[in-house]
Amino acid sequence: MPNNYRLEKVSSLLKKEITLILQNDLENDLIRDHFVNISKIDLSGDLQHCKIYITSTAQEKVRTEIVENLNTAKSSIRHSLGKRIEMRRVPEIIFKDDVVLDKGLSVLKLLDELKNKNQNHNVEDKDAKS
């Protein structure tokens, strides 16, 4: 089993090369029209399987379609990867939508709502005391 340093190096290389493939080689208008970014790569310890989490500026429905398009084109992407990097075996890849950003934004929205409620209650309390 490779050490963590090797996993990090290979993950970094995969992220860099797949980003270049998405930007330059992939002929997909949906992906080109929306800013698609690789947020995280989970690489298995044996370097055989790779989950690629993407974020995009698109709405959730469009992001789902982008992920479907990427998974449809994954054999082409994997083939391009094989030409670009020297590995005994290019890992099997699967694309997933990274929902962490959405969850973080919803938490921030809830915190803002709570803050506004507290401010409104404080104003009402001050008015009642006056």
Swiss-Prot record:
Gene3D superfamilies, per the entry: 3.30.300.20
Localisation: Cytoplasm
Subunit structure: Monomer. Binds 30S ribosomal subunits, but not 50S ribosomal subunits or 70S ribosomes.
Keywords linked to the UniProt accession: Cytoplasm, Ribosome biogenesis
GO biological process: maturation of SSU-rRNA
Protein name: Ribosome-binding factor A
A family per Pfam: RBFA
Record HAMAP family: RbfA
A cellular component annotation (GO) from this entry: cytosol
Signal peptide, first to last residue: none
